Amino acid sequence: MKRSWIQKSFVCMMVFMMAMGVVQKPANAQGDLDVNAKAAILVEASTGKILYEKNSDTAQGIASMTKMMTEYLLLEAVEEGKVKWDQKYTVPTNVSKMSHNTSLSNVSLREEGTYTIKDLYESMAIYSANASAMAIAETIAGSEANFAKLMNKKAEELGLENYKFVNSSGLNNKDLAPYVDQVVGGAEEENVMSAKDTATLAYRLLNDYPEVLETSSIAKKMFAEGTEDQFNMPNWNWMLPGLIREYEGMDGLKTGTTDFAGACFTGTAERDGMRFITVVMNVDVSAGENSYDARFNETRKMLDYAFANYSIEEVLPANYQVKGQKTLPVEKGKEKEVQIKTDSPLSMVIKNGEKDQYKPEFVLDKKKLNDEGELTAPIKKGEKVGYVTLKSSEKNDLGYLTDKGTNASKSSVVAVESVEKANWFVLSMRAVGGFFGDIWNSITSTVKGWF
């Protein structure tokens, strides 16, 4: 009986210790978050720092998230003066017919009616109007086919890797075919991008054209208000303030749904100066849940996790000197070494409580060094000689969306003072001293060898 009690106590103690071990195990970003979608990604918006990813490099259907690329190309065309917001568009027969297809998301456009590019843009960004996307594509490139070429070219310029665009709206080609002379690609093909590429597009859209949020944040608007064509446009992003799945700080960006792509959503929200970008693609729908709720529920999960766990913190101050590398040797200078320091503070997106996991790493500019690892005078005060970056002890660091983010995680290392080149006499004396020093060292070594 006593032995049985001891055995039971031992087992209970072991279970308790194992449980404590599980509780005390350091948190892992990938392990903390489980998104129910075929692909997903979570990114900090100012740096492009990837905080979570799931199957993010595989191309998937994107449906109407396509319209972010159409928006980018339109905003670029406006910036370059090729298109004006108050420019009038006269609706041709094919676009008018498409706009009256009630099985697609649309606002009705009268044949031969005129609408401003701003009207068409807002109907596309807010209500995901497909005919409006086609109208914008024809305005910019002359045809859907030409616009698809521009989309793919821009994708390459933006550094996207796993994508293919066949139309401006994100529709399946079978739905587009009745309204164009010829579809691009297969008869039932759709646009595809990876979750990482979709996040990169959103990142570039937000950073290159932040005014996109002025429209994507509109919860409801009347199209062509005051005319016979006026139409109430509720935003398909139900997480906007005032809508049924509202989320604090939500102000964009684009939903998407087709049979091929499933329910998708690229979201962005900002609180207290911190902005995040989320992408969910082909979300899993639980019993009793509809696909609209599912994509917003998974997005909410990601954003709650991000706002609760991450912040931007200064890790290194300006004028920081790397321990053990406060100076560099200088060849042919009046001084034989020069002090170095960082020229700016270094901040990073860091998970709460993990600041100590990041250690500075000094990287010299090899082009500045001779074969002996020395700088060569003259050296100017403030001259860049390398950079400091931060390395995490965690092996699962996911990196950044773009090189811009990677570069933002570095601080230049510069010379603290100028070092002038020594005159010919000093250099000659050093050379002579070095010559006799070498002879003396040689003699010393030889003599030592006798004993």
Name each region found by the language model.
Residues 2-29, 432, 439, 443:
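Sec-dependent N-terminal signal peptides of Gram-positive bacterial secreted proteins and lipoproteins
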Residues 21, 25-196, 206-209:
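Active-site-adjacent loops and short helices of periplasmic peptidoglycan-processing enzymes
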